[in-house]
Amino acid sequence: MKCHRCGSDNVRKMVDSPVGDAWEVYVCEKCCYSWRSTENPVVMEKFKLDDNKIANMGVIPPIPPLKK
């Protein structure tokens, strides 16, 4: 199986449906894209990633604590 966003073969099943075999969720270990087996994942060309884009991605800042 290949990632629909970056084309990597490094994809793993993250979780199974809690009810029967309704669906599975897969995640790409390279770009963190995830999708359900029941979805038809379509990634628009401008959102696809390559090695250069992944290497230059910014770091996502942590979520600050809630104010009391």
From Swiss-Prot:
InterPro entries: VdcD-like. Keywords: Aromatic hydrocarbons catabolism, Detoxification. It comes from the Bacteria. GO terms for biological process: catabolic process; response to toxic substance. Induction: By 4-hydroxybenzoate and 3,4-dihydroxybenzoate. Involved in the non-oxidative decarboxylation and detoxification of phenolic derivatives under anaerobic conditions, however the precise biochemical function of ShdD in metabolism of phenolic acid is unknown. It is not known, if phenolic acid decarboxylase forms a complex composed of ShdB, ShdC and ShdD. The term subunit is often used in reference to the operon, however there is no experimental evidence to prove the existence of the complex. This is Protein ShdD.
